[in-house]
Every structure is written in structure tokens, then in C-alpha cells.
Amino acid sequence: KDGYPMDSKGCKISCLISDTFCDTECKMKKAKSGYCYSRGLACWCEGLPENVEVWDKATNKCG
């Protein structure tokens, strides 16, 4: 699956322009790849395993 990975507080992992940083963060969660989604200023992962939690507006616990 694809989605925004979360930090330990349930927030999206923010980024500015570093695709390398996001790619590393995503691969640590077993994704195929990741990049910095500039509109959201957050990392976006592609190819995550189904059991990895991703940020969802409906279940947002960040803050």
C-alpha cells in the first residue's frame, strides 16, 4: 500500500525537499521507495506492507 508514514506520536514525517531522507525512512518500514511530497511537506511511501500503519485524516492522533 502507499501512504504517509507516521512517527511515534502518530504524526506525518515532515520533510522539506529531501527525497533521500524519505526514501530511507520508508525503506526502514519495508516500503519499496519513498519521496518528499512537496504539497504536504511530508514523506510519502510506496509499496508498504499492509500491516504498516499510515496517517489517515479520519484516525489522526497527531498533536
UniProtKB/Swiss-Prot annotation:
InterPro entries cross-referenced by the UniProt entry = LCN-type_CS_alpha_beta_dom (IPR044062), Scorpion_toxin-like (IPR003614), Scorpion_toxin-like_sf (IPR036574), Scorpion_toxinL (IPR018218), Scorpion_toxinL/defensin (IPR002061)
Cellular location of this protein? Answer: Secreted
| GO MF annotations in UniProt | sodium channel inhibitor activity; toxin activity
GO biological process terms, alphabetically, are:
defense response
Domain LCN-type CS-alpha/beta intervals:
1-63
- CDD domains with a match to the protein in the record: neurotoxins_LC_scorpion (cd23106)
Q: In which tissues is it expressed?
A: Expressed by the venom gland.
Q: Does the keyword Disulfide bond apply?
A: yes
Which cysteines pair up through disulfides? They are C11-C62, C15-C36, C22-C43, C26-C45
Q: Which residues carry this modification: Glycine amide?
A: G63
What are the record keywords, sorted?
Amidation, Disulfide bond, Ion channel impairing toxin, Neurotoxin, Secreted, Toxin, Voltage-gated sodium channel impairing toxin
Q: Which GO terms describe its cellular component?
A: extracellular region
Record's Pfam families? Toxin_3
Q: What does this protein do?
A: Beta toxins bind voltage-independently at site-4 of sodium channels (Nav) and shift the voltage of activation toward more negative potentials thereby affecting sodium channel activation and promoting spontaneous and repetitive firing. Is highly active on insects, since it provokes paralysis and death when injected into crickets.
UniProt note: domains: Has the structural arrangement of an alpha-helix connected to antiparallel beta-sheets by disulfide bonds (CS-alpha/beta).
Q: Which family does it belong to?
A: Belongs to the long (4 C-C) scorpion toxin superfamily. Sodium channel inhibitor family. Beta subfamily.
What is the protein name given in its UniProt record?
Ct-IT2
Give the taxonomic lineage as stored in the record: Eukaryota, Metazoa, Ecdysozoa, Arthropoda, Chelicerata
